[in-house]
């Protein structure tokens, strides 16, 4: 089963693709958000290319599990995706994914690798691989 993961943001959306056979994911180029509008063409292209069985969207919660301002935006984004693509859209806890993404990128590639787009897509990888582990249980 092919799954696309999206790390929702108001300026960039991190993207990763993976499959549940190996429970691994790889990052893809992030999608820019302009004037709070999603680039549907780029997302359509991704869906056409990868033909995912589902999309996992990062669900941003506070450390204590409560919702924050961007949580509702992510939930609304997920609803839009469900209406557009007619495939399962699954929210998955993304707490600390950005912190982990920065640590991985810094360790592998150094300080210069810490660009926002790269961090967002690495966060999407972390979200998807976490979802694979969660969905096994």
Swiss-Prot record:
SMART domains: YqgFc (SM00732)
A GO MF label: nuclease activity
Highest taxon of source: Bacteria
Keyword Hydrolase annotated: yes
Alphabetic keyword roster: Cytoplasm, Hydrolase, Nuclease, Ribosome biogenesis
GO cellular component terms given for this protein: cytosol
Enzyme class per UniProt: hydrolase
KW Transmembrane (keyword) present: no
Location(s) in or outside the cell: Cytoplasm
Pfam families on file: RuvX
EC number, as in UniProt: 3.1.-.-
Any Gene Ontology biological process: rRNA 5'-end processing
PANTHER family attached to this UniProt entry: POLYNUCLEOTIDYL TRANSFERASE, RIBONUCLEASE H-LIKE SUPERFAMILY PROTEIN
Family per similarity comment: Belongs to the YqgF nuclease family.
Function, as annotated: Could be a nuclease involved in processing of the 5'-end of pre-16S rRNA.
NCBIfam families, per database record: RNAse_H_YqgF
Name of the molecule in the record: Putative pre-16S rRNA nuclease
Higher taxonomy: Bacteria, Pseudomonadati, Pseudomonadota, Gammaproteobacteria, Enterobacterales
């Amino acid at each position: 089963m092919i799954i696309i993961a999206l790390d929702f943001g108001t300026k960039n959306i991190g993207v990763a693709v993976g499959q549940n056979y190996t429970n691994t994911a790889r990052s893809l180029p992030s999608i820019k958000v302009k004037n709070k509008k999603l680039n549907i063409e780029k997302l359509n292209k991704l869906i056409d290319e990868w033909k995912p069985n589902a999309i996992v969207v990062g669900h941003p919660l506070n450390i204590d599990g409560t919702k924050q301002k961007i949580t509702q935006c992510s939930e609304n984004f997920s609803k839009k995706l469900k209406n557009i693509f007619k495939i399962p859209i699954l929210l998955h806890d993304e707490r600390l994914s950005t912190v982990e993404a920065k640590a991985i990128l810094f360790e592998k590639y150094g300080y210069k690798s810490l660009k926002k787009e790269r961090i967002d897509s690495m966060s999407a990888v972390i979200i998807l691989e976490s979802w694979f582990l969660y969905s096994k249980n």
